[in-house]
Amino acid sequence: MRTFLFLFAVLFFLTPAKNAFFDEKCNKLKGTCKNNCGKNEELIALCQKSLKCCRTIQPCGSIID
């Protein structure tokens, strides 16, 4: 019975993992379509379904295209 309660508590409080593999890509596969861009991301385009194309901001010293 204790094992069941322990497993229930562990599984109940675990957050579901996000699978980024199936996310919609944009800007030549360098950005992702989201509802809102994160703190370290910039809005670069608009996606379908009123989503925003967000791309991680690169530091000034490492510009890669």
Swiss-Prot record:
GO terms for biological process: antifungal innate immune response; defense response to Gram-negative bacterium; defense response to Gram-positive bacterium; innate immune response. Residues 1-20 form the signal peptide. It is found in: Secreted; Membrane. InterPro entries: Beta_defensin_dom. It comes from the Eukaryota. One of its GO terms (cellular component) is membrane. Keywords: Antibiotic, Antimicrobial, Defensin, Disulfide bond, Membrane, Secreted, Signal. Expressed specifically in epididymis and lung. Coiled coil: none annotated. GO terms for molecular function: CCR2 chemokine receptor binding; heparin binding; lipopolysaccharide binding. Disulfide bonds join 26-53, 33-47, 37-54. Has antibacterial activity. Acts as a ligand for C-C chemokine receptor CCR2. Belongs to the beta-defensin family. Monomer. Interacts with CCR2 (via extracellular N-terminal region); this interaction may preferentially require specific tyrosine sulfation on CCR2. This is Beta-defensin 106. The gene is DEFB106A.
